[in-house]
Amino acid sequence: MSLSITLVIVVISGIISYQGFNNRSFFDRLKHYPVAEENSKEYYRMLTSGFLHGSWMHLIINMYVLLQFGEIIEYRFVDLFGNMGRIIYVLFYLTAIVIADIPTYLKHKDNPSFSSIGASGAVSAVVFAFIMYYPLQGLTFIFFPFFAIPAIILGIGYLIYSSWASEKGRDNLDHLAHFTGAVYGVLFAIVSNPSIIQSFADQIMGAF
């Protein structure tokens, strides 16, 4: 049985993140740093930063979520597009990394104190593509495995929080990238499979 593309992404992310943990110069060259992207045209950072993480916990959480949802979307694309499905999935994931970073690039291109790393924007895109296909699927939290919430409810809450935190938050998380990635996941799901709109609506209406 061949490895899933999702698992390959997890392995590559783990290798690159581990290198970043142990080599600060490597880390600094690959991180999302809008000032360098603007002044030195190092736009590659908006892609490479998606394979870096700041800690083992950061890496593990992102890759755990990606494995939970990514393989489902990957195989859904294979069902829809045949042999092209995995290629489309790779393009989806890679473009999600970049798209999620564009707003923070525009916001912080003159701010030398801002930088970010992590796959969270792309992972958000994958999760929200899942929500478009399975809006009523019960989702649980790692620490509360017996309490399930419909995916659409969690998704709405995530968007509201990410929007608020991108303006008011005082932590070091790139909430704007999370929000942008989530929106991109919805749009990609619709553009790649327009019939999903009717399926989504039918599932929501069927719940009432």
Give the predicted meaning of each segment.
Residues 1-208:
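A detector for small-residue-rich transmembrane helices and their helix-helix packing motifs
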